Amino acid sequence: MAHLLKTVVAGCSCPFLSNLGSSKVLPGKRDFVRTLRTHQALWCKSPVKPGIPYKQLTVGVPKEIFQNEKRVALSPAGVQALVKQGFNVVVESGAGEASKFPDDLYRAAGAQIQGMKEVLASDLVVKVRAPMVNPTLGAHEADFLKPSGTLISFIYPAQNPDLLNKLSERKTTVLAMDQVPRVTIAQGYDALSSMANISGYKAVVLAANHFGRFFTGQITAAGKVPPAKILIVGGGVAGLASAGAAKSMGAVVRGFDTRAAALEQFKSLGAEPLEVDLKESGEGQGGYAKEMSKEFIEAEMKLFAQQCKEVDILISTALIPGKKAPVLFSKEMIESMKEGSVVVDLAAEAGGNFETTKPGELYVHKGITHIGYTDLPSRMATQASTLYSNNITKLLKAISPDKDNFHFEVKDDFDFGTMSHVIRGTVVMKDGKVIFPAPTPKNIPEEAPVKPKTVAELEAEKAGTVSMYTKTLTTASVYSAGLTGMLGLGIVAPNVAFSQMVTTFGLAGIIGYHTVWGVTPALHSPLMSVTNAISGLTAVGGLALMGGHFYPSTTSQSLAALATFISSVNIAGGFLVTQRMLDMFKRPTDPPEYNYLYLLPGGTFVGGYLAALYGGYNIEEIMYLGSGLCCVGALGGLSTQGTARLGNALGMIGVAGGLAATLGGLKPDPQLLAQMSGAMAMGGTIGLTIAKRIQISDLPQLVAAFHSLVGLAAVLTCMAEYIVEYPHFAMDATSNFTKIVAYLGTYIGGVTFSGSLVAYGKLQGILKSAPLLLPGRHALNAGLLAASVGGIIPFMADPSFTTGITCLGSVSGLSTLMGVTLTAAIGGADMPVVITVLNSYSGWALCAEGFLLNNNLLTIVGALIGSSGAILSYIMCVAMNRSLANVILGGYGTTSTAGGKPMEISGTHTEINLDNAVEMIREANSIVITPGYGLCAAKAQYPIADLVKMLTEQGKKVRFGIHPVAGRMPGQLNVLLAEAGVPYDIVLEMDEINSDFPDTDLVLVIGANDTVNSAAQEDPNSIIAGMPVLEVWKSKQVIVMKRSLGVGYAAVDNPIFYKPNTAMLLGDAKKTCDALQAKVRESYQK
């Protein structure tokens, strides 16, 4: 039994079962009470934890004795962190004085201040510099270390074998801070990077101190000061820190590195990357560059020799682990620099990258100041000590995560990037035994290049899996649902008038559908502008509900007056903006126009109606029909350049006839007519003023703002109609229908109003263009929709006025909020779809007014606008290979995205300067320019137009290729180019130009990224997979003009940047285009 009990409790961790296995059972009788007294001997203790309790360990922080070393291994904050962990900390008196950490701060942090010998005899000693001979005592610091103790310091074991032997005699365990593996998990302990960061920054500060001019360029009354030119060699931590500091001070920064990734980082900081013509990768181990071939070094020397003659300051950081620093700049190169220049050698401690460097010294050689200090981190001792202290405290906590005991295990078998990898790499000596270097870790990640299937191949496979039966069934189901819906409308129709109105709505929608499909994409912007103006017919609803005398006398009349006022803004402003855009498309060779003659049909239509009205004829319905047909003609006229001005004129005639018929049908008294005229005149004046002053580049935000007015007018009209009609609801059999339409119109108007305002804010730069992805936004939108739909129940069930107006107010608030949440979640790149959707919304709001007021004109015009906006939205979505729901709900990815890991882009890019670009342009005979939103933002259309004119005069074939979603609204780029005088007949759409790229000599990509991204066709896992793009990479040569190699709005890397036929011309679009145009002009004038 005793054996069984021992077996059961052998693994017990309860404190009650202590010493059961080792306790002797004494012979003889035992008293029961005695057994209870000795019950503790019957319970086992917890398993003993490995390691030593923190409270039994002392961490020592000695003063650094290396010459001019001002750093200290632990800051007071670091001491406090270790004391909190449980360590006892002792600091040598004065250890932190040079770092501005007096002894009192250490005492306050919980440390004890002791002498040098007591500190070095601690269990764990932390230092900056490796132990060395103390000249005062004439003894080595290692001799004072506690036997079998632990040392954490910079060691450099490969260069200091004698030191390792000395430490081995003391059986020391050594953690070398310079050997921390450069893996992701160890970034917080990487002291080399911390110190290099400080060295890079300090190098720029010292250079600025010894340089005789400003870093930044200045224009003063005394003259112009050019910016300093700085070359930084080495794109490691120090080099990038130098680049960032120099760039922030306004210098022109150039960076060189043999590694492509480092050059990319230079670019991200705004520095100009330099490369040699010879392509060779310099990627080495541990984050360092490897030694390059003889041919590469020769090309490198040639580049450096040229740069020495141009730059003012040289900063070099090139190191090779375990070896002397390479000499990159000869004495002749340095002497070729301008007098007063400065060179800073961050590799001085390893011999230096300059032949003229004197390690540890600052001196002047033939007018060139040389800074060869080897203690740059020490010259910022406070900051350096703080970062080094953070590295050590984080390392100690990471290698020994136990809360009570200090313990870590050194393994020779470990995986790459794990904590075992960090420990084994850092520990260079264990209990006196040298274990440096560490063995190679397992599972080093390797990228196996796998050529994925193209998007077209995957789409073909997907299409092959869908049977004809499924396709036919889907189509039949859609038509069945549509016809069933028509039958349902017939059943619920309250009267014949409703059925007639639905018929009008349906026919107008069909006409609008076929009319808008015929509009050329170049005229999509004028189309949206003219529909904006026509949607101002919400004024008809406002006029119908206005009342009072010179001023409105009731709430409903005030709402109606306000609706009329803001609708008039839309009418006048929309037509004037449309006319301005159409005037831009006129070519010098076009025949003269006599558009004033369109006053004849306008005057006949309106004047004839007034004559008929005076004669006692009531022909308002015919007027509405005529106005509706004119609006149809307006949309149809904008299908081609030749009839576009007629279309705008027909729109004006239609709106004028509709307003005249409305006033004639109402027959207001003179006082009310004055109120109506005043509201429309004021609104029209404001609209004309805005339209006259607006810049064409700001057209998208103007359209969005005008959409908001339509939505607000619809809300006001619906609420006013409810207030006016409420007294008649009890006697009107169709009152329920009126209430439903009023509720629906209020909801649509609210969404249109707020959504348009958010779109305006994003386009104008008032709000961030990035999508606002609220947590749980889909649930929030679903809740708002459910609340809006649910609100109709009390609205219809309770006949009281208070409930009705409250429900309308609530749905207007809910829909307004929903418009904000929906539109805020959509990024700037999707604004073309947002604007077209809002355009469609405004049309449906107008339809609701038409049903509400039983007005054929509003129904016809609303159906036209609604269908045109829907079709444009569909065109935009097809151009991005995305569904409308995906865009509206703030989604990402195309319908073809496979969802796997995106393809990694390999290779190097080629950069050219303006002279190279001019030469390529001169040699090309066929040129295509593909602009993007970058051209719009920079307003670079004018220099490009002038460039096109020059090239055309030289006999070159120059055309433009426009992507449907380039810009921030449909057709925006076409209008901007027309504004600059580019003939519209050389501006082609994507479908027209794509087949011509293989025969094109040169393509200029200006400010475009996603719309020319080949990943859409090459990478099935890309979030833009399957998106139709301009296939510019198929041309013979491509010049991409961008600010940087950064991604576009879709945040997708662009493979064309690294294709062999692509050259990058980086810089601001406007400045680059201006300079390019000037250079081309200069080249042809020679």
Curated annotation (Swiss-Prot):
Organism: Mus musculus
Annotated EC: 7.1.1.1
Single GO cellular component term: mitochondrion
Residue intervals on the Cytoplasmic side: 723-739
Residue ranges annotated as Mitochondrial matrix topological domain: 44-474, 579-595, 880-1086
Residues annotated to bind NADP(+): 933, 965-970, 1007-1011, 1026-1027, 1042-1049, 1068-1069
Location in or out of the cell: Mitochondrion inner membrane
The protein's name: NAD(P) transhydrogenase, mitochondrial
Function: The transhydrogenation between NADH and NADP is coupled to respiration and ATP hydrolysis and functions as a proton pump across the membrane. May play a role in reactive oxygen species (ROS) detoxification in the adrenal gland.
Binding site for NAD(+): R182, V183, T184, V237, D257, T258, R259, G287, E300, L319
GO molecular function: oxidoreductase activity; proton-translocating NAD(P)+ transhydrogenase activity
A Pfam family the protein falls into: AlaDh_PNT_C
Transmembrane regions listed in the UniProt entry: 475-493, 501-521, 527-546, 558-578, 596-616, 622-642, 646-666, 672-691, 702-722, 740-760, 778-797, 801-819, 833-853, 857-879
Membrane topology designation: Multi-pass membrane protein
Residue(s) carrying N6-acetyllysine: K70, K397
